[in-house]
């Protein structure tokens, strides 16, 4: 591991630190990047340190503490490893989707009569499931989240099934009592959480209940409103379209009448289902006796041991959301091969029309498509953004064709995240999607209408807030993860379909516990490293060479490094970044205080000796410092150009400490590498210019002009990093992106925000 030390005590080049009287006034625009907000920044270090666990000053105490913490950390890591292994096992056995059972769909399958003409159900195991899963209050439905629509639908369906076979009268009576006592509550249901096809399916169930003479309050005002809505929606359904092409209407055939089944059978999915709905497929089989429908139903009844889900399969959806959750929870690095398998599967099933929840469903949606596009592009696959045009109409974007309420929070949120991954030359649809989705989400956020029609998650408003406030170019991995640990609901997250359901592979407490343990390990390492960095800083006596707020610079330098490069085995790169940033700041501060570099060329070796590197990388490090220091002597040198040079210095230092750096003249990929350096330098210079334009009260048009230039260069850098030259190590390409995103983050965030993030990421324990 490369290690370096610095000692300024005996360096005559710097002389004595300038006194306040001797210091020359700073020219406008001559502040280092980390101090762009310095005049408004409150002290960061002491405030944060006081909130963190105490860091003993003496070596004896420190060693004693380190030993005890080491034992605790080893135990935590062992626990984390066990959980990671459990997740890995689940990912390796991923199939067509893990989903909870739907009492509603199971009941409709239970109504199917024996094919041989005998008495009783064709699938008796469905009856067994119904009998075994009645809840204590007499209802059926999701046991952990009470939604009246879900309970009424599920309970009524189960009662109809049991009554149809004249069995388990006691359970029927308890279910009926629940319905009688609670039907009125439907009028008070949350509109944003309406079950899919509820107003079509419930009246159909009620008609079946009437035929069975079930004692239900059919005249309840809430039901009259639902019947009226059913008639309104059925009147809007174009029957020619319904029978001619696959649409989402195929998902709710059990609630429709006067259907031409001969035509509809041509619209089945390849697996024999109607839009992957067991209830809809059961109705189709009841009406037609179609063998493929039977094979689909028989397969899922056996797979789920009697019960059936509300939708199946979900092979695409499950893989996408699992990768997304693991990435945002910060533990994706443990599952590189499993994630590669998932995304290879997605890429194989990618179509010009987009994606659906399963590979064989012809009805695509923007949610799966946007998530797929984003993840595939992030992981280096080549996908065309023109696919989003399939979900664009009249300047708006919708989730599914024919939706009565075309826009909901989570599909637009996922599309907004995807739209930010632009490459030069991409179709303008990404830009239009970004504008529309941002406006939509801003409107929902401003009016406090953040409930989603597809999911009931722990903190959707928090997820949207982060995406809106921190664009991808300024979002740092550990910040996103720390906030998402508070937003992710684990097993508490519920999904809305025909009934409420759970996606157990990617919404579970094991993910959450593993991620929290992993992050806790990271925090402990950060505190130890930060403590050591502080001691190194004091021993090196860097503070006496100026800087607006040395403690803040130290804290921010380390935070930016650790927020990007957080893996335990990359401590050398993390600390190398932080130390080089601190040294560069000290040198920059000194030069500004004495009016610029004097006799720099003749004393260059003496200045470089401030950072003696006694290892195999010393030559590369010395060359990197030499080039940075020489930039100060250039006639066209300005603080803006120095910022770009500092970004390159950081990149080179990180690469050197990661053991990946090759001297520029020896690189076989010289042109591609130089392009990455040029883009990095240019973006960071423009970010500095943008901040100054804002602080100096320049016009909005001027700032927007800089933003447009930044966006174009950021698109090019993103393309070169995500899909660039294979001769350049992926980690090397990502280093450029890490440094640029850290500069973006500082430019776009207030000092108070940065302070809060430092506190949250490093010092606030994950509970």
From Swiss-Prot:
Gene name tied to this protein: CPS4
List the keywords (alphabetical). Isomerase, Magnesium, Metal-binding, Plant defense
The molecular function terms of the Gene Ontology recorded here are: magnesium ion binding; syn-copalyl diphosphate synthase activity; terpene synthase activity
Which intervals of this chain are the motif DXDD motif? 365-368
Protein name in UniProt: Syn-copalyl diphosphate synthase
**Kind of enzyme, top EC level?**
isomerase
Return the Pfam families for the record. Answer: Terpene_synth
Reaction(s) catalysed by this chain's protein: (2E,6E,10E)-geranylgeranyl diphosphate = 9alpha-copalyl diphosphate
Starting at the broadest rank, the lineage of the source organism is: Eukaryota, Viridiplantae, Streptophyta, Embryophyta, Tracheophyta
Q: What is known of its domains?
A: The Asp-Xaa-Asp-Asp (DXDD) motif is important for the catalytic activity, presumably through binding to Mg(2+).
Name the domain of life: Eukaryota
Concerning what turns on (or off) its expression, the entry says: By UV irradiation.
Region feature (Disordered): 45-74
State the remark under miscellaneous: Phytoalexins are diterpenoid secondary metabolites involved in the defense mechanism of the plant and produced in response to attack (by a pathogen, elicitor or UV irradiation).
EC code: 5.5.1.14
Give cofactor(s), names only: Mg(2+)
Q: Where does Mg(2+) bind?
A: 365, 367
Q: Which residues form a coiled coil?
A: none
GO terms of biological process kind: defense response; gibberellin biosynthetic process
Q: Please list the residue ranges that the record marks as compositionally biased, kind Basic and acidic residues.
A: 59-74
Q: What does this protein do?
A: Catalyzes the conversion of geranylgeranyl diphosphate to the phytoalexin precursor syn-copalyl diphosphate.
Residues binding substrate, per UniProt: 233, 453
Q: Which GO terms describe its cellular component?
A: chloroplast
């Amino acid at each position: 591991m490369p290690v370096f030390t610095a000692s300024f005590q005996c360096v005559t080049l710097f002389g004595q630190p300038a006194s306040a009287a001797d210091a020359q006034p700073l020219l406008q625009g001559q502040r280092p990047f980390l101090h762009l907000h310095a005049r408004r920044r409150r002290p960061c270090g002491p405030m944060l340190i006081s909130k963190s666990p105490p860091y003993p000053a003496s070596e004896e105490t420190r060693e004693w503490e380190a030993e005890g913490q080491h034992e605790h950390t080893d135990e935590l890591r062992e626990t984390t490893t066990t959980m990671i292994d459990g997740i890995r096992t689940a990912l390796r056995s991923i199939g067509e989707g893990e989903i909870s059972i739907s009492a509603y769909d199971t009941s409709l399958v239970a109504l199917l009569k024996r094919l041989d003409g005998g008495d009783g159900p064709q699938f008796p195991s469905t009856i067994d499931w119904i009998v075994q899963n009645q809840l204590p209050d007499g209802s059926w439905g999701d046991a952990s989240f009470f939604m009246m629509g879900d309970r009424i639908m599920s309970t009524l369906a189960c009662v109809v099934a049991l009554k149809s076979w004249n069995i388990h009268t006691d359970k029927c009576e308890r279910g009926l009592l629940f319905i009688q006592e609670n039907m009125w509550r439907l009028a008070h249901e949350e509109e944003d959480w309406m079950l899919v096809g509820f107003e079509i399916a419930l009246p159909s169930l009620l008609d079946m209940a009437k035929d069975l003479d079930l004692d239900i309050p059919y005249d309840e005002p809430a039901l009259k409103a639902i019947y009226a809505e059913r008639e309104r929606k059925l009147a809007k359904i174009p029957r020619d379209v319904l029978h001619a092409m696959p649409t989402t209407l195929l998902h709710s055939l059990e609630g429709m009448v006067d259907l031409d089944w001969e035509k509809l059978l041509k619209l089945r999915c390849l697996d024999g289902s109607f839009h992957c709905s067991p209830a809809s497929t059961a109705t189709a089989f009841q009406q037609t006796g179609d063998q493929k429908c039977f094979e689909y139903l028989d397969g899922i009844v056996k797979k789920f041991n009697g019960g059936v889900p509300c939708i199946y399969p979900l092979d695409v959806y499950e893989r996408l959301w699992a990768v997304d959750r693991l990435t945002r929870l910060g533990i994706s690095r443990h599952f590189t091969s499993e994630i590669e398998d998932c995304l290879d599967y997605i890429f194989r099933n990618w179509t010009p029309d987009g994606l659906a929840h399963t590979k064989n469903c012809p009805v695509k949606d923007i949610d799966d498509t946007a998530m797929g596009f984003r993840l595939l592009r992030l992981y280096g696959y080549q996908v065309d953004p023109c696919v989003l045009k399939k979900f664009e109409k009249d300047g708006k974007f919708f989730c599914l064709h024919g939706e009565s309420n075309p826009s909901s929070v989570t599909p637009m949120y996922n599309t907004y995240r995807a739209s930010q991954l632009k490459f030069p030359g991409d179709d303008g649809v990404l830009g239009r999607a970004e504008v529309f989705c941002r406006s939509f989400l801003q409107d929902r956020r401003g009016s406090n209408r953040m409930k989603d029609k597809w999911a009931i998650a722990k903190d959707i408003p928090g997820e949207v807030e982060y995406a809106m406030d921190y664009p991808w170019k300024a979002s740092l991995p550990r910040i996103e993860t720390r906030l998402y640990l508070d937003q992710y609901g684990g097993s508490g997250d519920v999904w809305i379909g025909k009934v409420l359901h759970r996606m157990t592979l990617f919404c579970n407490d094991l993910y959450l516990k593993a991620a929290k343990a992993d992050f806790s390990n990271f925090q402990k390492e950060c505190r130890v490293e930060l403590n050591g960095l502080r001691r190194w800083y004091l021993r090196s006596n860097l503070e006496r060479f100026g800087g607006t707020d040395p403690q803040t610079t130290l804290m921010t330098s380390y935070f930016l490094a650790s927020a990007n490069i957080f893996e335990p085995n990359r401590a050398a790169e993390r600390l190398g970044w932080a130390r080089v940033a601190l040294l560069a700041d000290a040198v920059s501060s000194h030069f500004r205080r004495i009016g610029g570099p004097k006799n720099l060329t003749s004393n260059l070796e003496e200045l470089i000796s401030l950072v003696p590197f006694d290892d195999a990388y010393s030559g590369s490090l010395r060359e990197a410092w030499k080039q940075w220091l020489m930039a100060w002597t250039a006639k066209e040198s300005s603080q803006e150009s120095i910022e770009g040079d500092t970004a390159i210095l950081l990149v080179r230092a990180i690469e050197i400490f990661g053991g990946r750096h090759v001297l520029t003249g020896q690189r076989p990929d010289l042109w591609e590498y130089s392009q990455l350096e040029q883009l990095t330098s240019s973006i960071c210079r423009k970010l500095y210019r943008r901040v100054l334009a804002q602080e100096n009260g320049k016009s909005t048009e001027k700032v927007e002009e800089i933003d447009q230039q930044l966006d174009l260069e950021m698109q090019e850098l993103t393309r070169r990093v995500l899909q660039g030259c294979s001769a350049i190590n992926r980690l090397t390409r990502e280093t450029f992106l890490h440094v640029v995103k850290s500069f973006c983050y500082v430019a776009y965030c207030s000092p108070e925000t940065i302070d809060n993030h430092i506190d949250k990421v490093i010092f606030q324990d994950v509970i």
